[in-house]
Every structure is written in structure tokens, then in C-alpha cells.
UniProtKB/Swiss-Prot annotation:
GO biological process, one term: glucose 6-phosphate metabolic process
Entry GO MF terms: carbohydrate derivative binding; glucose-6-phosphate isomerase activity; monosaccharide binding
Reactions accelerated catalytically: alpha-D-glucose 6-phosphate = beta-D-fructose 6-phosphate
SUPFAM superfamilies: SIS domain
Keyword Cytoplasm in record: yes
Gene Ontology CC: cytosol
Gene3D superfamilies to which the protein is assigned, alphabetical: Glucose-6-phosphate isomerase like protein, domain 1
Keywords: Cytoplasm, Gluconeogenesis, Glycolysis, Isomerase
Organism this protein belongs to: Synechococcus sp. (strain CC9605)
InterPro entries: G6P_Isomerase, Phosphoglucose_isomerase_CS, SIS_dom_sf, SIS_PGI_1, SIS_PGI_2
Annotated protein name in UniProt: Glucose-6-phosphate isomerase
Pathway in which this enzyme or protein is active: Carbohydrate biosynthesis; gluconeogenesis; Carbohydrate degradation; glycolysis; D-glyceraldehyde 3-phosphate and glycerone phosphate from D-glucose: step 2/4
Gene expressing this chain: pgi
UniProt superkingdom: Bacteria
Amino acid sequence: MSFPDFSASDAHIQWQRFCDLSWYHDDLGVWLDISRMHVNASDLQQLQPRMDKAFAAMQELEAGAIANPDEQRQVGHYWLRTPELAPSSELQQHISREIDLIAAFGRDVVNGTIKAPNGEAFTDVLWIGIGGSGLGPALMIKALQNPGEGLPFHFFDNVDPNGMSNVLAGLEGRLDRTLVVTVSKSGGTPEPHLGMEQARHRLEAAGGQWAGQAVAVTMLDSKLDQQAQKEGWLKRFDMFDWVGGRTSITSAVGLLPGALIGCDIRDFLSGASQMDAATRMADLRRNPAALMAASWHVAGGGRGQRDMVVLPYRDRLEVFSRYLQQLVMESLGKRLDRNGDVVHQGIAVYGNKGSTDQHAYVQQLRDGVDNFFATFIEVLEDVSDIPTISGECPGDFLDGFLQGTRSALTESGRQSMTISMRCFDARRLGALIALFERAVGLYGELVNINAYHQPGVEAGKKAAAAILNLQGRVEAILADGVARSADEIRLALGDGTDESIFWILRHLTGNQRGFSAQGDWSQPASMRFSKG
């Protein structure tokens, strides 16, 4: 495991490190270069015993071990692209059958065989999903949809009323021909439920027929699945209980959008499967995900002390940094390790796209605080319909900007790694996602945290539910028309805090809900609120 130590000023050493630390997959046409990370041979030697344990843990996970003890469930997203790895023949058949059903449904909607209830072809898709159920589909659409192919997509990925209003306004006149897909694993998550009810209300008001336009992606026998069965929805697809939202893109959550834009979803799965095979290798120097995880660990001192800046030099990958933000931060951002010790682990992720970012925050990356490492992503092949004009080729400039930024960062002693792809399509997107999924899993093992649960997210959901409950009680107190301060309401309730009650009242008075406020807003304690 010998290669030169990092040197920012010696071009010969940089070249030698590039040759020694480059990984390449011939069939996929994918390179990984970690030579500009400050990783030395001694670092990899020191990590080797822990990486060996990480390889073994990942092997157990793929074999069906309980990987998420909090929920006593398996973690099986790797089975989705290689069904024969699933621990039972019944499960293998179920996965394969779902893929076939998704592909057939998408094809039949796109070619007009499956029609809207009014007898016309579907014109649009309204996708309702939060977190990974929204980010994964958004990535699929941005990365893989070609102009004029498949159906246009519109998203409810938040409960912002203004956002919903804008989306619905954009569907005006086509709501009765819009396919509405609601994604909710448990069927009980508030955000997709609220979006679904708003979509149903507007669709039916426009003359649509909900059951004939609605599709559910959820666990079998969940609340949403039961509702879809009872109401006779157009289609239901399974969201397996052993697939987490942030790793659900190779399930129906990502495959259905792919099928509805005319993408070959089997190519997408094939790319992920090929990268899974490459990252399954228990050899640190020959496993790209292990090289990435080791680089992250060394760069951040095993404590996430450096942010990951994602710089894909293609517009199609503009959503990828946000997708990785959830995958990495929700997986690795943990207060406790598996021993119950407080560790506050995590890697912060941000980014957008090159070369746009060179005119934004790259200034700080080069000259400001050195608290990050960059991840460049390049695609070599350019489209053929953008010609060279007056000797100037946009693709050459894009490549030059990437190399220039990479060199400028190195000159400043800033760390980076680069992923290069010969071309970009569904197969390469699948491979790219699988590469990061495995790197996240391996890193989680290196720092001894559970990368497959999200207690912080659950805590936020419980706190939100408590606020909504408090709001109902505040409204009940004010129903008598008597003006009260936040403190008086708290005393009457015997619960809550002045601040949370003030926030609730400020929201209520900001909308036409019949509540009014008197006093000086700059003096919150002086404000009095009433209804009527």
C-alpha cells in the first residue's frame, strides 16, 4: 500500500499519486480519483482493520441481518437491483414482479393505453412525496428526462400553501388528465396526506375522478394502501418496509418516475447493480466506495470536521447535491454511537453545479476557511447538437473550468476528489447513486454509528404534533372573544410556553382565520389576541 504522500507543490508527486490512487470501471466507464485528498499510505494502513470489519458488516447487511435495531428491520435496498441477493425466493420473486409491473404501467401510461377517466391520455404527473420520496424522483426527472419524452412532472414536496397553489395553477385545465401519485411508506406521514387531500379537492372541483387518477406507493396494508384499496385507486405499488426513504430511489419511488418519463429503468438498476458488485470487494485499494469512505474519515478526523462540497459539472446533476445532502446527513448525523456514547457524528453536504458555483461560493473555498473537501463530478461526452462556433466549444470551457477550479483549490492546499464518467445516462446515474450509498454505509461502520435510523427526524415530527395540538387548545381558549396575552393563555392552559403560543398566534393573525392582535409587535409581551 505504497504511494507518495500528498504534495500541493510537486507536480511529479501529484501525477504519481494520480496514477496510484485512480480507480476505473471499464464497462461503466467511471473513474474515481482521490489523489488530491490528503490521504497518505499510513492513513489507509491505520484504517485497514476497521475497514475489514466494515466490509464484514456490509456483507451481513446484504445477507439480511437486522441492520436497524431501533426498528428491528432489515436494510435491503441492495436487493432491489439484484433480487437474487434477497434472503428468500418469495422476496426475490416479489421484487422482480414489482419491477415488471412498474415498467408495464409506465409504458402504458406514456403510450396512452392507460387513460384518464375521461377517456383521454394522461398529460401530466403530480408527484406527492416528502424527503427521499420527493428528492429521489426529482433527481430522476432532472437527470434523465429528455425533451418531449414521457409526461411532465409537478411536485408537492412540501406543505407550503403558496407552493401548492402555484403547482395547481400550472395544471389548470389539465387536472382531469393528471396522474396523481402519493408516496408514503407508513401512510401516516402528515405532509403527503395534506398534499393528497389538497390535490383531491382541486381535481374533483375540476371535474376529475380521483380513484381513476390516483396511484399509491406505500407499504402493503398501510393506512394509505387500505384507503387506495377501499376507494379503488388506479394502481398501488409496494414500498418495502426494509427500504428507507433516503435509499428508496431504486424502489418504486424512483422507478415509477423513471418509467413515466420513458426511461429504461432496467438500465438504471443494472448500473446500480454493477457498482454494488464493484463496491462489494473487500479490498480497500480496489473498492471505490471504501476509498471514498476512508478519504472522508481522514479529511474530517473521523468526526466530520470537514464539509462535503458537491460540484457536478452538468446541469442534469443539479439536484444531486440535494439528494446527497439527505443521503449523507440523515444517515451519518447521529448524536450517539452504537455503544450509546455521545459522539455528534456527521458530514455536512452542500453544493449546486459547475461552472455556476465558480461565480458564487468557490471564492471562499479557495481563500476562506479551510473546513471542507470538494467532490467534483464530470461527464466527458457532450451532446452533438451544440457545435463549435468560431473555434469555441462550450464543453471545452466546462472541462477547463473544472480543471482550473480543481487546480486552484490544490494550490491553496484545499482537498478534493473527482468522479468522472465517460457518458451520462440511466445506467451511470444508478452507478453513481450506488457508489455513494455504499460509501455512506462503510463510513457509518468506521465511526460505529447506525446509518439506517433517524431519531432526530422522529423527534421533530413529535414536536410538530405537539405544537399542532397546542394550537387547537389555544384556538379553543380564544373562542369566547376575550383578548388575552400569550402569558395569560399559557396560564389558562397550564401548558406550553409563552414563545410557542406567541408563534401560533402570530401565524393565526397573519391569515384570514378570524383572529386579531392589538399592541406593539416589537414588544411581544404587550400583545393581546382575540377572535371575532
